[in-house]
Amino acid sequence: MENQKQRLGRLAEDAAQAFLENQGFTIVERNYRTRVAEIDIVAKEAETLVFVEVKARGAFSRGGPREAVSLAKQQKIILGARFFLMERGLVDVRVRFDVVAVYEENNAFRIELIRNAFQTD
């Protein structure tokens, strides 16, 4: 049985997927997992493969969504993206790392897309 945080996370991912699709993204995969990382959503926007971290912020959450994706979390997502590309034999592919912030407000969601939230260096 899922707890309140898990429920909010699942609903936020569903809302984020619908939002991205409405923005013209094509969803490639959800909840991609490796031994070291999980990527919430892998999507395509035009010719760019986008790795998306979904951050749900409830009424009592502290900090913004960008701050919620720590440097360590960014590194895990980047590593997961490398595994994804390698497993599928994808080379010379344009990639981007976005964060979708899902704010729960008055039993509804407000969604913010943060493009290029972080990059590989």
Swiss-Prot record:
It comes from the Bacteria. InterPro entries: Restrct_endonuc-II-like, tRNA_endonuc-like_dom_sf, UPF0102_YraN-like. Disulfide bonds: none annotated. GO terms for molecular function: nucleic acid binding. Belongs to the UPF0102 family. This is UPF0102 protein HRM2_30940.
